[in-house]
From Swiss-Prot:
Domain of life: Bacteria
Residue sites binding Mg(2+) per the record: T26
Originating gene: tuf1
GO cellular component, one term: cytoplasm
Function: GTP hydrolase that promotes the GTP-dependent binding of aminoacyl-tRNA to the A-site of ribosomes during protein biosynthesis.
Species in which this protein is naturally found: Wolbachia pipientis wMel
Region of interest called G3, as start-end residue ranges on this chain: 76-79
UniProt binding sites for GTP: 19-26, 76-80, 131-134
Subunit composition and interactions: Monomer.
Region of interest: G1: 19-26
Sequence segments annotated as region (G4): 131-134
Record has Acetylation as a keyword: no
Location (main, coarse): cytoplasm
Protein name per the record: Elongation factor Tu 1
Keyword annotations: Cytoplasm, Elongation factor, GTP-binding, Hydrolase, Magnesium, Metal-binding, Nucleotide-binding, Protein biosynthesis
């Protein structure tokens, strides 16, 4: 979400490589950085630093590179399980994904799973790189392209218009000057620049602030504090208080930061917002302040979840239908029950599954909202809302 033009002098986009194991994701990442970034050798990418996000360890490699038009931050994961976790936990929110498919083997099970996950977690664009073209048969490459386009369409991406680049990441890494070598990387970068739109900066989106704390200031009224997630708020604007109970309308009568009054607050800032005529007991942590009509409270939704393994600090045993953990959404824990789908009877630690969740109280939410699943105060899983039900 950060189109930080200021820092790099050009728009910024987050991308990542996805695709089946051994189809060449890491080799491609190395080839791109060799020609467009500070070169990172293959074995350095694979020895990724372990990142801890919400207590879940994901091995990811972060590299960056730039074209004349843009700056890209790129994430590559060594193992399939890490991809699944990374996409669900959102340790690296991808604006676009480069789908790597071997021209020798064509789409494989993880190719499908990664495309489906990309759709569920809201990756906006996919660009395809058909790899190993130097050792694949030309007819086979045409067939692979057709299959990949069909697969993308099946999972809701515009399969007919997705750019497909054919090449060899290994040849590109060896500085080969043929069509399949460095030229294929140039073409891939060109397609990323052309096809992937720079995401709107959070500031341009409708105002939203998850409430962290509520204070009563004598003579001035009620102040709520939190970090503005997106948009801007100005004194005098009408806002809604959403979630946990009936939605209320109020007016922002002041925005303050570090005891200073501001004329407006914008995305990324931690602020206090003074609410007109709202009593201290009418607002609580876990609700959100938002621009009227932009977000609604819901109790039932479908989600894509990852359940931590025992070694990651998760449960030691499986759970069954109607399991009732806490769901930590934005700033608060809410109890809910999990319904298993597709005839599944239980979920093992380490599994990635689609589930239906029903919360005991409604929470302001949109598709794409990420949450942690907790039990007795510790995180046992992580998820992302894939569809609102009611």
């Amino acid at each position: 979400m950060t189109a930080v033009v200021e820092a790099f002098g050009k728009p910024h986009v987050n991308v990542g490589t996805i695709g089946h194991v051994d189809h060449g994701k890491t080799t491609l990442t190395a080839a791109i950085t060799k020609h467009y970034g500070n070169f990172v050798a293959y074995d350095q990418i694979d020895k990724a630093p372990e990142e801890r996000k919400r207590g879940i360890t994901i091995a990811t490699a972060h590299v960056e590179y730039q074209t004349e038009k843009r700056h890209y931050a790129h994430v590559d994961c060594p193992g399939h399980a890490d991809y699944v976790k990374n996409m669900i936990v959102g340790a690296a929110q991808m604006d676009a994904a480069i789908l790597v498919v071997s021209g020798v083997d064509g789409p494989m099970p993880q190719t499908r799973e990664h495309i489906l996950l990309a759709k569920q977690v809201g990756v906006g664009y996919i660009v395809v790189y058909i790899n190993k073209a130097d050792v694949a048969d030309a007819d086979m490459i045409d067939l692979v392209e057709m299959e990949v386009r069909e697969l993308l369409s099946k999972y809701g991406f515009p399969g007919d218009e997705v750019p497909v680049v054919v090449g060899s990441a290994l040849k590109a890494l060896e500085d080969d000057s043929s069509e399949y070598g460095k030229k294929s990387i140039d073409k891939l970068m060109e397609k990323l620049d052309e096809y992937v739109a720079v995401p709107p900066r959070p500031v341009d989106l409708p105002f939203l602030l998850p409430i962290e704390d509520v204070f009563s200031i004598s003579g001035r009224g009620t102040v709520v504090t939190g970090r503005i997630e997106k948009g801007e708020i100005k004194t005098g604007e009408e806002i809604e208080i959403i979630g946990l109970k009936a939605t209320q309308k109020t007016i922002c009568t002041g925005v303050e930061m570090f005891k200073k009054l501001l004329d407006k607050g914008s995305a990324g800032l931690n602020v206090g917002i003074l609410l007109r005529g709202t009593k201290r007991e009418e607002v609580e942590r876990g609700q959100v302040l938002a621009k009227p009509g932009t977000i609604t409270p819901h109790r039932k939704f479908k989600a894509e979840v990852y359940i931590l393994k025992k070694e990651e600090g998760g449960r030691h045993t499986p759970f069954f239908a109607n399991y009732q953990p806490q769901f930590y959404l934005r700033t608060t824990d809410v109890t809910g029950s999990i319904k298993l789908l597709d005839g599944k009877e239980m979920v093992m630690p380490g599994d990635n599954v689609s589930v239906e969740v029903e919360l005991q109280v409604p929470i302001a939410m949109d598709k794409g909202l990420r949450f942690a699943i907790r039990e007795g105060g510790r995180t046992v899983g992580s998820g992302v809302v894939s569809e609102i039900l009611e």
